């Protein structure tokens, strides 16, 4: 009896060791109680023994006899492939023992694939019957091939083989959960490549097409929800479309010598080793809460992300989801954390997710995220970071099409903006993407000054920021005029036609339009100075600019209703919320609670346009030294080509000043020297009434000397004392010119 127990102990130990090896590179950790390693270990051994006999001892008389009367007797010539299927299926079971439905599906698919492959071989060998002898059967399709093919013997051989091929394709669809249409497309594409290789080699799009089809086969088009198969995928693609689109080379204009920076310019960090003991303690504490309140539920596993670990809880029969949600405070008490979030259900699973912050957080380096982006991906593709299961999260800014970012101080909002801009600098040519950076805080984006992607110097003056946004609106209208004139609906189609020289203009030379990305680092400062003008421009851009290739990212520390107005929210469909201070702020940015429970430092909730629920991510991190290296590199490749932004002032200079000209000049000199735009000060110093002082202040506002009124506060003076003489000369000249007109 003791010997039997010893054998069982050794067997379990070997199975556990094999399972641990199979799970080394898995993104998902498994609790010990959920591991089922003995069955997959047995399959692995069968596959290993089969590989030895079928491959390495091929031609040996003993190997031939053993194979002939065992596996080859059942599957015939297909038995040479069976070791691969057995070993692959065993690794799948090692990693996913709790996915009962998926395991049954894969088992059925593999059996279908093996059976109909054997039947196809049996028809190819002339369909011998068992009476022909075991030796002939083992060289054809075996007993399985004969049984499966027997109902098809009434058909001609070529039709029977066609039916077998159809079922083989169907089995691949069952195994991979991929639509048959995509599998057929891939088969035809490779068949075309095989029989027409010369034409494919000369096609400039062949490599992109094959990579695109590979993404279709593996299911990496944009998933409807971020949770589908997240443990099986290392990359999650968000925001509506696949990232590949057109290759980078199609976006480059006539520019030539510019070379994109290598990703080696960014820092590399060693992978973090996780300790499952900490997660086991949490599961023990959570299980204690369930027992204490008599809740029939069990934990089926956990997924460790960089910031939080998601524990999967399967409910027993008759247990309401509301019971788990009602225990949130008790769970927080048990794990000693006030940042517990409950996801009910986990998208794509019949399980509840309990997200608990890790005691030791993982740094998500921007370099590692960008390494996961396909080289031919869209130039506006950026790496957001990692999700709660540890998979990389990517998004295409053109499909968002606009983004609203909010978070309190220290939440990681500015770090995300830096990562996004750095991603663009690393992956996009200046002729592909141009940037408009608006930084009212003056210090956040100053590091990017002089990069060739800028279309105008970094804007730090809120008053000028309003004018720049008006210029963006005019640029959008110019692009739409071209689209309408030449009959295109999107700027990409227009650019392709221009590069192919399919269209031309008599009045000017047509050139491709670059994407224009507008980034506002602090929306609240702009809304404080010129709320009406800023909101009007932002709403125009967000309503209409998508097809013209113009996209805007709005970031703010204060997601209050007077900053993020209803019109702005309605037209900016994608949201990214970092940690905020209150439930009210979370509802403003996401229209739901959740952001108030984030732990800060890059922990965020991303709600793309195509997702029903926000996805928890850890934003990627890039250091200031890395940014400096990237900026210095791109500045060494090209110089910025600034546009002249011609924007007409909202106010009109009143030329009918009459006898007030001397007073206006005195008022201008007084305001600029004192740097105080106060109407009451003009009343006292110039000894004029309130109406006259107010008129003088309005005239100075129309001339860009002072900013708009701010209630009882003094107006901001926009001209420095060093520019006093030139300003006085400009006033005199403008009034004289208007009189001549």
Curated annotation (Swiss-Prot):
Segments passing through the bilayer: 39-59, 74-94, 108-128, 136-156, 163-183
Molecular functions (GO terms): ATP binding; ATP hydrolysis activity; DNA binding
Similarity field: Belongs to the FtsK/SpoIIIE/SftA family.
Keywords on record: ATP-binding, Cell cycle, Cell division, Cell membrane, Chromosome partition, DNA-binding, Membrane, Nucleotide-binding, Transmembrane, Transmembrane helix
Function: Essential cell division protein that coordinates cell division and chromosome segregation. The N-terminus is involved in assembly of the cell-division machinery. The C-terminus functions as a DNA motor that moves dsDNA in an ATP-dependent manner towards the dif recombination site, which is located within the replication terminus region. Required for activation of the Xer recombinase, allowing activation of chromosome unlinking by recombination.
Protein name (database record): DNA translocase FtsK
GO CC terms: plasma membrane
Membrane topology reported for the UniProt record: Multi-pass membrane protein
Main location: membrane
Domain notes: Consists of an N-terminal domain, which is sufficient for the localization to the septal ring and is required for cell division, followed by a linker domain, and a C-terminal domain, which forms the translocation motor involved in chromosome segregation. The C-terminal domain can be further subdivided into alpha, beta and gamma subdomains. The alpha and beta subdomains form the DNA pump, and the gamma subdomain is a regulatory subdomain.
GO biological process entries: cell division; chromosome segregation
Cellular location(s): Cell membrane
Domain of life of the source: Bacteria
Binding locations of ATP: 410-415
Ranges of compositional bias, category Low complexity: 200-212
PANTHER family: DNA TRANSLOCASE FTSK, SPORULATION PROTEIN RELATED
Biased composition, class Basic and acidic residues, residue ranges: 213-232
UniProt-listed InterPro entries: AAA+_ATPase, FtsK/SpoIIIE/SftA, FtsK_alpha, FtsK_dom, Ftsk_gamma, P-loop_NTPase, WH-like_DNA-bd_sf, WH_DNA-bd_sf
Gene that encodes the chain: ftsK
Residues exposed to the Cytoplasmic side: 184-741
FtsK domain location: 390-587
Region of interest called Disordered, as start-end residue ranges on this chain: 200-232
One protein family per Pfam: FtsK_gamma
Subunit structure: Homohexamer. Forms a ring that surrounds DNA.
């Amino acid at each position: 009896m003791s010997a039997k127990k010893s054998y069982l102990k050794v067997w379990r130990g070997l199975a556990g060791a094999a399972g641990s090896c199979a799970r080394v590179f898995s993104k998902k950790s498994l609790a010990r109680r959920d591991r089922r390693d003995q069955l997959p270990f047995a399959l692995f051994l069968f596959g290993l023994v089969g590989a030895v006999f079928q491959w390495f001892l091929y031609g040996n008389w003993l190997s031939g006899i053993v194979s002939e009367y065992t596996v080859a007797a059942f599957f015939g010539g297909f038995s040479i492939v069976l070791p691969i299927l057995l070993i692959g299926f065993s690794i799948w079971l090692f990693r996913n023992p709790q996915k009962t439905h998926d395991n049954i599906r894969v088992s059925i698919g593999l059996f279908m694939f093996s059976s109909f492959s054997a039947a196809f071989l049996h028809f190819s060998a002339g369909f011998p019957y068992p009476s022909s002898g075991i030796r002939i059967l083992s060289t054809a399709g075996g007993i399985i091939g004969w049984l499966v093919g027997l109902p098809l013997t009434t058909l001609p051989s070529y039709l029977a083989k066609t039916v077998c091929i159809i079922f083989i394709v169907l089995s691949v669809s069952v195994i991979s959960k991929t639509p048959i249409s995509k599998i057929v497309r891939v088969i035809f594409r490779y068949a075309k490549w095989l029989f027409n290789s010369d034409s494919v080699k000369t096609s400039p799009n062949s490599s992109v097409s094959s990579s695109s089809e590979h993404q279709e086969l593996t299911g990496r088009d944009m998933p409807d929800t971020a949770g589908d198969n997240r443990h099986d995928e290392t990359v999650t693609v968000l925001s509506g479309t696949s990232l590949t689109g057109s290759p980078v080379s199609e976006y480059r204009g006539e520019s030539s010598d510019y070379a994109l920076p290598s990703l080696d310019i960014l820092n590399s960090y060693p992978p973090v080793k996780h300790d499952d003991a900490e997660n086991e303690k949490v599961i023990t504490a959570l299980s204690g809460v369930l027992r204490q309140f008599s809740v029939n539920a069990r934990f089926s596993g956990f997924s460790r992300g960089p910031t939080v670990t998601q524990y999967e809880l399967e409910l027993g029969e008759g247990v309401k989801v509301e019971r788990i949600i009602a225990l949130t405070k008790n769970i927080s008490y048990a794990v000693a954390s006030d940042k517990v979030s409950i996801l009910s259900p986990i998208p794509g699973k019949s399980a509840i997710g309990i997200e608990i912050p890790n005691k030791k957080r993982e740094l998500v380096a921007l370099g590692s995220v960008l390494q996961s982006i396909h080289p031919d991906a869209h130039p506006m593709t950026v790496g957001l970071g990692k999700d709660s299961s540890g998979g990389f999260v990517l998004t295409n800014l053109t499909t968002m099409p606009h983004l609203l970012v909010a978070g309190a101080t220290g939440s990681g909002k500015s770090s995300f903006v830096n990562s996004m801009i750095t991603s663009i600098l690393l992956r996009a040519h200046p002729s592909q993407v141009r940037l408009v950076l608006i930084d009212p805080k003056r210090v956040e984006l100053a590091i990017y000054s002089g990069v060739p992607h800028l279309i105008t110097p970094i804007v730090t003056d809120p008053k000028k920021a309003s004018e720049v946004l008006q210029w963006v609106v005019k640029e959008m209208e110019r692009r739409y005029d071209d689209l309408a004139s030449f009959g295109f609906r999107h700027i990409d189609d227009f650019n392709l036609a221009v590069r192919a020289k399919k269209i031309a203009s008599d009045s000017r030379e047509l050139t491709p339009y670059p994407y224009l990305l507008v980034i506002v680092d602090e929306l609240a400062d702009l809304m404080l100075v010129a709320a009406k003008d800023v909101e009007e421009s932002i709403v125009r851009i967000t309503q209409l600019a998508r097809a013209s290739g113009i996209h805007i990212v709005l970031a703010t520390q204060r997601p209050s209703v007077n900053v993020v107005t209803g019109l702005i929210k309605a037209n900016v469909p994608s949201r990214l919320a970092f940690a905020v201070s209150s439930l009210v702020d979370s509802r403003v940015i996401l229209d739901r609670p959740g952001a108030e429970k984030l732990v800060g430092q890059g922990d965020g909730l991303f709600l793309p346009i195509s997702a029903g629920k926000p996805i928890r991510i850890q934003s990627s991190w890039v250091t200031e030294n890395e940014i400096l290296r990237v900026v210095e590199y791109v500045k060494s490749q090209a110089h910025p080509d600034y546009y002249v932004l011609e924007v007409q002032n909202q106010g009109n200079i009143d030329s009918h000043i009459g006898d007030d000209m001397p007073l206006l000049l005195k008022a201008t000199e007084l305001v600029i020297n004192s740097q105080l735009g106060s109407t009451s000060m003009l009343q006292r110093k110039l000894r004029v009434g309130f109406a006259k002082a107010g008129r003088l202040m309005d005239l100075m506002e129309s001339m860009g000397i002072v900013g708009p009124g701010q209630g009882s506060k003094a107006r901001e003076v926009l001209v420095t004392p060093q520019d006093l003489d030139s300003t006085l000369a400009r006033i005199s000249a403008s009034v004289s010119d208007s009189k001549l007109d």
